[in-house]
UniProtKB/Swiss-Prot annotation:
Compositionally biased intervals (Basic residues): 1673-1689
Protein's gene: Cirl
Membrane topology annotation: Multi-pass membrane protein
Region (Disordered): 183-304, 376-400, 1234-1259, 1452-1540, 1568-1690
Protein name: Latrophilin Cirl
UniProt-annotated glycosylation sites, renumbered to this chain: N142, N256, N302, N341, N398, N655, N703, N730
UniProt cross-references to InterPro entries, sorted A to Z: GAIN_B, GAIN_dom_N, GAIN_dom_sf, GPCR_2-like_7TM, GPCR_2_extracell_dom_sf, GPCR_2_secretin-like, GPS, Lectin_gal-bd_dom
Organism: Drosophila erecta
Modified residues (Phosphoserine): S1156, S1253, S1260, S1329, S1330
CDD domains: 7tmB2_CELSR_Adhesion_IV (cd15441), Gal_Rha_Lectin_dCirl (cd22830)
Primary location group: membrane
Lineage: Eukaryota, Metazoa, Ecdysozoa, Arthropoda, Hexapoda
Source organism, top-level taxon: Eukaryota
Subcellular location(s) of the protein: Cell membrane
Length: 1710
């Protein structure tokens, strides 16, 4: 196939090889045209009129029209000169007419002299320039006139690299349309030995040709010759075909080994008069096999050859019709007053310049990627396209790949759908087009006798009114520079200084005006006629020309002067200053000189003086408008020297990947400020001693970022940042500092308007991962905070807990602010607030980490190692330092520069300036270094302590602190990794760093690990929290029933042993039996052998699990406790019957009890009044442990035996009538007292005997088994809420199975009483007179009624225990190891409701008010019995009894006023006797002041006296604590608590007494011991204060009275001990405590029932009571006594998670 030449004939080709000439003739003159002999004239174009102001204008008239044209000028000339050797035509209106009257016209003719033999085919169509074709050897070997098509030939050797070819590559290397080898024939036989072959005029490369046969294609319907074919059909049967080459066998194996794998299309335009842009389609796959179609190989199919160029099928047989073929051609269009015809992709259309300008215009057609529409899949198959069938003959060439070639061609066709032919650049290249008048000015300026002022003036006038082309811009700037150079020599010819200055100033004015005209908007198209490189060159020439002319004037001025030239687009200022007058920096421009911009440049005084010359400083300032639209950043485009393209989205076609996978996403940078210039006379562009300061206003404030201070480099014609730095920036302005002078501006990145958040730099996967990571971390932080809040009962309010709460809050704020900030734009005000708060949160978080490390260090170096309590002053100091310092630093930063939070690219970062490093980086580093330093010091201290001999509890606490420090250190390192990775990722993404993604994924991983670490090591690892999680989840209604435990379940546990044997769990339970406490089972009742089993040690988790209401597995077998006394350990005997808790020496406490679903976390509330006869059991051979079953209905039971009481032997052997009664579930409570040695001494601070928490972790409680906490607390119940408990009935079910009729009757009676009690309670609530009464009623416990005759005698101990009685009591007294027992005197508890009901439990569940848990009492520390051990005797007790009988009883140092009050003399006598006999007063080294109020009345003064005496005894005890520590260590007992705890307990005791006495006096209660609080009446000795009452009778007797009563009790029942019931119900007569829980209506009824007779009767009865009552009388009120209803005091207790019994005494009514 032989193509023809586009749009021209061969004759035209020869004509263009001739010289191109132009002739002019002014109006009235003759135009003569002549050619050489043998040649004739060939006219190209002609015009009679005026296109230029400079031609035929000797006088410089600028008023003539330059758009004057006679349309038939060419026809007139052709009639006179066409095809002639010479001719002459008169340029006159008589010949051509007058197209523009008043304008002096001229005749212009463009012609060529061609051979006379070619005149027959010459046409008037404009022809391409002469270098389209070039001379060379014969094109056809056989002499035919056909031109060989491009791309056919043996192929030249591959060049070392892909060259940048000119716009039209000529033959034999010369410019031309085709690149044909010199030795070329019509038919060639070659193998693809070269991967680079010129095609389509050298535009498409990378084609290795195979054997081809050329044919001339059919003519086109539009009359134009068809374009040369890029791909050729293979004719297997043509006559000229010679041995076709098979690619599968002939291709060399390494033919394409050097080809890269990708293909990049680079498009551009030429410059400097030639088209040196290229369309590069090189680089094919290096992994081609010989059996596959290589680049440019022949793919057989349907009898046609499908030639591919790097998998791009530009033209194939599969394409049919004009639509497919038109994709390879750019359509015709009009641009710059020229018509551009259809042009093939890769070719350059060339034609003459428009409007009378000399030169040629060029425009390239390229194949560019089409922007895909939304929802359009660019690789979807065309539904209309069909895949051609493959013939069997085609498969013979490659049977293994018969179908793939067709599929590959189809795929290539689909890829071509995404590309379209496009004219590039957007406007034609008119760099070579020059107006004729500018050529005339250029010639004039080079003449010696020309007037420079006239030339400059003509240039300024023409540029302001005429349209310029690209070449005109080059000529104009060249003239400006030439004028300045000539004026530099010509000024010496003017002897007068003023004349010289005037001439140069006029020249400068014309030059500035010309420059402003070039920058005007009307000349924008002229700038676009230039390629980007030429634009930069012209701009540089304009700037230097203006500067040269300005300094020409500055050098002429010899005195101080300032000249300002202000035009539309340029402000120029020339200043000549004397150095002596320079007092400060010089600023340009003035505010009133340049209103177009607020830009400002400031030159320091020192820099000016250093560059002075002759005492004068010459400065040139310039400010430009619209220059920023020309001086574009060059590195935004591709390499201009090789491609000259500014197309950012370049298509990359890969052989192995999709097209869009290789799209280049480059950063788009713009010049975002006006250009401002400054130069000094000496050296002009020199380094300055001091930098200058520039303030530049941003032209665009939205969607721009990353400002950079740059200057224009004259050498490279590009912007450079060397020597300039950004000082500060905000949304509208930037401040720069540079150490040299030139033209300055601001470069900024453009952010996509549709995606302007931080996530625009994330790919899809990373964005999802960041969301997930932050979400996980936030969830776990919230869980940690909720754990601290919901399960606050588990934790001690310590400094460590407060620190970690603050850390969690700071981390939560940081995560949320980061997530919110990365979605915001960097230009919004809200973004600034996010950055501010994030700054503060990070500083606070790092500060809290530092304080946490410091707290661990201080714990190890102080006495806080063994006692972790709330340290409010220290925590407050932490709060002040953390948040105070953080807010102060942020405030200082805001005051210094508020814009630092709004000028950065992202909302989560500050701008990296000096303020950022001073207010953010430095404080964070200081806190982190301090935290690491304190952690290192803590490790050193722990290593030293581990080598020293410490007590067991100290080692335990040290291990806990060591674990906390390890966790904190890992936490700190993990948090540092999170923040560092986030910072480096953001910075890297900002600079398009390749490592940004690595940091991004590191941030995702570390942030996720941070959340998991918080949850695991700060929540899950703490066994207390795990237990609370189980309880919290299982006790809520939103869970299925299968996951929740029964609300009626009973949890219990027993801890026995000391030391290694501590923590032994001993219990037995069977499947679905009565829910008895641990230690009770039916096997234990029936099988004595089972009771002899050895205890089974169990871990802390199992112990706590057994005590949880959800952990009791009723189907499991539990063992009972082995009998006997272990060495050094007191243990329960085998007679452990009826659920109870055994407390042993040195052990912790576990208690049975129902855990209500409404119980607060970490507590087990004990509920009393289960139906069971009262029992008192002595456990073990020493009878150390007791248990009690408070029985609400025991007074209803018929008496059995002697008075319904068992003998001591019956109790001990579990015989008698009670033995046959069913054993029912019940709940009791005990509390421990701190063991103490016999001798006391002063002990050191901080050595309080608080064993370590089982977990020993972060949230360890300081309360332990040896600590008893007293709370005045109550629970508000809802109206109509039942108070019965279903476990009562459940506990009675098993006896029914045995057929016990008595048990069944007992159960029925109990159920009826409960129902009656519930009904009466509801009626009482309905009778409430107001809402206030109802609230008060709900806020108190149930009403209790004292019933006479319900108390039973204390059972005597077994006979074999008598010999151990004295030793046991003495040891128990010395060690203060006692049990609070409810076995005696339950008349105080077994009382009915207010209405006299018989049913209902005695107690409701009591919820502790956690806010009131502020008083911690150590019962063991309240050891006042040692003070009165030898001083208080029987006489004191008798005197106290006599005083009580006389009506002058004192309680706690205060007056108990009933019917009468003791006199002042009796009080003084008792006080004096007490002080004389007190052993504590003799050993007292100091006195403790009481916290009593001096403003109390006379009765309160007496209370203060007793309180002071009590404090004396406590203070005396401090001196002996040091000695007690030694004995504590010897016995393995925990040491005593510190002095503060004892003082607090004493003050609470005194406060209780005062309130109680006021209540008695308020109601006028008689002196009845039954009405006294616990310990007020005569009682036997009890070892330890209980329920906030220290015991004692009156002032002179405190603990001695207990000893007296204990001796009296021992006389009746050896080994008997007074229980709590006796403490609260003293004596056998007198009214009970006033009912504090009565409603106002009930109180009024009670007051109405009171009468003087009853009061007198009570007083009389009390006065005749026996001063030394029998123990039986102490616990039994008179059968006929009917006490009035006074305030009653109720007692309850709960066991917390730290084995601490919390006893609750009902608060007194106000």
């Amino acid at each position: 196939m032989l193509p023809t030449i586009l749009s021209i004939s061969y004759e035209h080709t020869y004509a263009y090889l001739s010289k191109y000439q132009t002739a002019y003739a002014c109006e009235g003159k003759k135009l003569t045209i002549e050619c050489e002999p043998g040649d004739v004239i060939n006219l190209i174009r002609a015009n009679y009129g005026r296109f230029s102001i400079t031609i035929c204008n000797d006088h410089g008239n600028v008023e003539w029209s330059v758009n004057c044209m006679f349309p038939k000028s060419l026809s007139v000339l052709n009639s006179r000169c066409a095809h002639k050797q010479s001719c002459g035509v008169l340029a006159a209106t008589s010949m051509f007419g007058d197209p523009c009257p008043g304008t002096h016209k001229y005749l212009e003719a463009h012609y060529q002299c061609i051979s006379a033999a070619q005149t027959s085919t010459t046409t008037n169509r404009p022809s391409p320039p002469p270098w389209v074709l070039s001379n060379g050897p014969p094109i056809f070997g056989n002499g035919s006139g056909l031109i060989h098509p491009p791309g056919i030939g043996a192929g030249a050797p591959p060049p070392p690299r892909l060259p940048t070819l000119p716009g039209v590559v000529g033959i034999s290397g010369n410019p031309g349309l085709f690149n044909v080898p010199p030795q070329h024939t019509a038919v060639t036989h070659s193998t693809p030995s070269s991967s680079t072959t010129a095609m389509a005029g050298g535009r498409l490369k990378g084609v290795a040709t195979s054997t081809t046969t050329t044919k001339h294609p059919a003519g086109r319907h539009d009359g134009l010759p068809p374009p040369p074919q890029l791909h050729h059909h293979h004719n297997h049967h043509g006559e000229d075909t010679a041995s076709p080459t098979k690619p599968s066998s002939k291709l060399p194996a390494g033919g394409n080994a050097t080809s890269p794998s990708n293909t990049r299309i680079l498009t551009g335009v030429g410059g400097s008069g030639t088209d040196d842009g290229t369309l590069l389609t090189t680089k094919s796959s290096p992994n081609r096999t010989p059996g596959t179609a290589a680049s440019g190989s022949v793919v057989p199919g349907n009898g046609s050859v499908v030639r591919t160029i790097n998998n791009i099928n530009l033209n194939s047989a599969g394409m049919s019709g004009g639509d497919d073929e038109s994709k390879l051609f750019c359509g015709p269009t009009h641009a710059r007053n020229l018509y551009w015809n259809m042009t093939r992709v890769g070719d350059v259309n060339v034609q003459p310049c428009p409007g009378g300008a000399a030169g040629i215009a060029k425009w390239r057609c390229v194949l560019m990627k089409r922007m895909p529409d939304s929802g359009y899949d660019e690789y979807d198959d065309d539904p209309s396209s069909t895949t051609p069938a493959t013939s069997s003959a085609d498969c013979l060439h490659n049977s293994s790949s018969c179908e793939p070639p067709v599929s590959m061609a189809h795929k290539v066709n689909q890829r071509l759908r995404n590309f379209e032919p496009t004219w590039h650049p957007t406007t034609p290249d008119l760099t070579q087009c020059r107006s004729l008048w500018l050529n005339n000015l250029e010639m004039r300026v080079n003449q010696r006798d020309s007037s420079l002022i006239s030339i400059a003036n003509d240039m300024s006038e023409v540029t302001s009114s005429k349209t310029l082309y690209g070449g005109d811009m080059l000529v104009t700037t060249k003239i400006i520079q030439t004028v300045s150079e000539k004026m530099l020599h010509d000024k010496e010819t003017f002897p007068d200084q003023r004349q010289r200055e005037a001439m140069i100033m006029e020249l400068l004015h014309c030059v500035v005006k010309t420059g402003s005209n070039l920058l005007d908007e009307s000349q924008l198209s002229s700038w676009l006629d230039l390629n980007p490189e030429d634009q930069m060159r012209v701009a540089t020439s304009l700037l230097t020309g203006l500067e040269y002319n300005a300094f020409l004037l500055a050098d002429t001025i010899i005195r101080e002067r300032s000249v300002v030239q202000k035009v539309k687009n340029i402000l120029l200022s020339v200043r000549v200053l004397e150095t002596k007058t320079i007092q400060s920096s010089v600023v340009f421009p003035d505010s009133d000189q340049w209103p177009l911009s607020s830009d400002r440049i400031e030159l320091p005084r020192a820099a000016l003086i250093d560059n002075s010359e002759g005492g004068l400083v010459r400065i040139v300032f310039a400010a430009f408008d619209r220059l920023e639209s020309i001086l574009k950043p060059s590195y935004d485009h591709f390499d201009l020297k090789s491609s000259r393209s500014y197309v950012r989205n370049t298509a990359i076609l890969s052989n192995d990947s999709d097209v869009n996978a290789g799209e280049i996403q480059q950063r788009l940078r713009i010049l975002n400020s006006k250009v401002i210039s400054a130069s000094l006379g000496k050296g002009r562009h020199i380094q300055l001693s001091q930098p200058i300061t520039l303030t530049l206003k941003h032209l665009k404030t939205e969607n721009v970022t990353n400002p950079t201070c740059v200057f224009w480099n004259y050498i490279d014609h590009a912007w450079s940042a060397n020597g300039c730095s950004l000082e500060s920036t905000n949304r509208t302005h930037s401040v720069c500092s540079c150490n040299h002078l030139t033209n300055f501006a601001i470069l900024m990145d453009v952010v996509d308007e549709h995606q302007h958040s931080l996530f625009t730099m994330f790919d899809g996967n990373m964005r999802i991962f960041i969301y997930i990571s932050i979400g996980i971390c936030v969830v776990f932080i919230v869980i940690a905070l909720l754990t601290l809040k919901l399960f606050n009962g588990v934790f001690v309010k310590s400094a460590r807990t407060s620190i970690y709460t603050s850390i969690y809050l700071c981390l939560l704020a940081i995560e949320l602010l980061f997530l919110l900030g990365i979605e915001q734009t960097e230009t919004s005000i809200f973004c600034g607030f996010i950055t501010i708060f994030l700054h503060c949160a990070i500083l606070s978080g790092t500060a809290w980490f530092c304080y946490e490390a410091f707290h661990s260090y201080s714990t190890l170096t102080s006495d806080e190692l063994l006692l972790e309590v709330d340290q409010t002053p220290k925590v407050n100091c932490y709060y002040l330092l953390s948040y105070g310092l953080s807010l102060s630093v942020v405030a200082i930063s805001l005051v210094i520069d508020p814009s630092t939070y709004t000028q950065n690219d992202y909302c989560v970062l500050m701008e990296a300036n000096a303020l950022f490093y001073a207010t953010f980086v430095m404080p964070v580093l200081v806190f982190f270094v301090a935290a690491i330093g304190y952690t290192f010091l803590s490790w050193i201290i722990m290593c030293r302590k581990s080598r020293t001999g410490l007590k067991t509890k100290e080692h335990t606490r040290l291990a806990s602190v060591r674990f906390d420090i390890r966790c904190s250190f890992v936490f700190l390192l993990l948090l540092s990794a999170v923040w560092c990775s986030a910072y480096f990722y953001l910075r890297g993404a900002k600079m398009d760093d390749d490592t940004a993604d690595v940091y991004g994924y590191c941030f995702i991983c570390f942030n996720t690990l941070l959340g998991l670490y918080i949850f695991v090591f700060h929540c899950i690892q703490n066994e207390k929290i795990r237990r609370e999680y189980r309880k919290y989840v299982r006790q809520h209604a939103w869970l299925p029933k299968c996951l929740r435990c029964s609300k009626t379940s009973i949890s219990s546990g027993i801890v026995t042993g000391n030391g290694p044997t501590a923590g032994t769990l001993c219990s037995v339970s069977t499947s679905k039996k009565p829910k008895l406490p641990i230690g009770v089972s039916e096997e234990a009742h029936d099988d004595p052998q089972q009771q002899q089993q050895t205890p089974v040690p169990i871990t802390e988790d199992a112990i706590m699990g057994a005590s949880s209401d959800c952990e009791l597995n009723e189907a499991q077998q539990r063992r009972t406790l082995k009998s006997g006394l272990m060495t050094g350990t007191l243990q329960a005997p085998p007679q452990t019957l009826g659920g109870h808790v055994v407390l042993e020496r040195g052990s912790t406490l576990r208690s049975t009890g129902h855990a209500s679903p409404t119980s607060s976390a970490g507590s087990t509330h004990l509920i009393f009044a289960h139906k069971q006869q009262q029992q008192q059991q002595q456990q073990g051979p020493l009878g150390e442990s007791y248990y009690h079953q408070p029985d609400y209905y025991s007074w209803k039971q018929p008496p059995t035996g002697t008075g319904g009481l068992k003998t001591p032997r019956e109790y001990y052997n579990n015989t008698g009538a009670a033995a046959s009664s069913p054993q029912q579930a019940h709940e009791v409570f005990y509390w421990t007292q701190k063991p103490n040695s016999g001798q006391h001494g002063k002990k050191k601070r901080g050595a309080g005997g608080v064993p370590a928490s089982p977990s020993g972790s972060l949230h360890s409680r300081t309360a332990a088994a040896s600590q008893v906490l007293f709370y005045p607390s109550y629970k508000k119940t809802k109206a109509g809420q039942p108070t019965g408990y279903p476990q009562y009935a459940e506990a009675l079910d098993p006896p029914l199975a045995t057929g016990n009729a008595a048990a069944y009757y007992q159960q029925q009676q109990q159920l009826r009483r409960q129902q009656l009690h519930l009904q009466q309670q509801q009626q009482q609530q309905q009778q409430l007179s107001s809402d206030e009464e109802q609230v008060e009623q709900h806020a108190h416990l149930l009403q209790l009624q004292r019933r006479a005759g319900s108390q039973q005698q204390l059972p005597a101990p077994p006979p074999h225990m008598a010999q151990y009685q004295q030793e046991f009591m003495q040891r128990q007294y010395r060690n203060k190891q006692s049990n609070c027992d409810l076995g005696m005197g339950d008349a105080y508890y077994n009382q009915g409701s207010v209405g006299g009901a018989d049913g209902g439990p005695v107690y409701e569940e009591i919820l502790s008010n956690r806010n009131s848990d502020v008083q911690h009492y150590e019962v063991g520390d309240f050891d006042v019995d040692e003070v009165y051990n030898n001083s208080v005797g029987t006489g004191v007790f008798n005197n106290m009894r006599a005083a009580v009988a006389a009506g002058g009883s004192r309680y706690g140092g205060g007056s108990l006023s009933g019917g009468s009050v003791s006199s002042r003399s009796q009080q003084q006598q008792l006080k004096k006797q007490q002080q004389q006999q007190s052993l504590a007063q003799q050993r007292s080294a100091r006195r403790c002041t009481a916290d009593d109020d001096d403003d109390e009345d006379e009765e309160e003064d007496e209370e203060a006296t007793a309180a002071e005496q009590l404090h004396d005894s406590v203070c005396d005890e401090d001196e002996e604590e040091d000695e007690s520590d030694l004995e504590d260590d010897a016995h393995g007992l925990p040491p005593q608590s510190d002095e503060r705890m004892r003082r607090l307990m004493a003050m609470q005791d005194e406060d209780f007494k005062r309130r109680f006495q006021r209540q008695l006096r308020k109601h006028g209660a008689p002196l009845d011991y039954g009405a006294l609080p616990p310990g007020a009446g005569p009682q036997p000795e009890h070892n330890g204060a209980v329920f906030g009452v220290s015991g004692g009778v009156g002032e002179g007797s405190k603990r001695g009275a207990f000893r007296q009563q204990q001796q009296a009790l021992n006389a009746k029942s050896p080994g008997g001990r007074l229980a709590v019931n006796d403490l609260f119900g003293h004596g056998n007569s007198g009214p009970p405590l006033p009912p504090a829980n009565q409603t106002p209506a009930q109180k009024r009824q009670q007051l109405q029932k009171l009468s003087p007779q009853s009061t007198t009767s009570s007083s009389s009865h009390t006065s005749h009571s026996n001063p030394n009552p029998h123990p039986h009388q102490l616990t039994h009120p008179h059968p006929h006594q009917h006490p009035p209803h006074h305030q009653q005091r109720h007692l309850s207790a709960m066991l917390d998670e730290n084995n601490t019994v919390r006893c609750y005494l009902e608060p007194l009514a106000k």
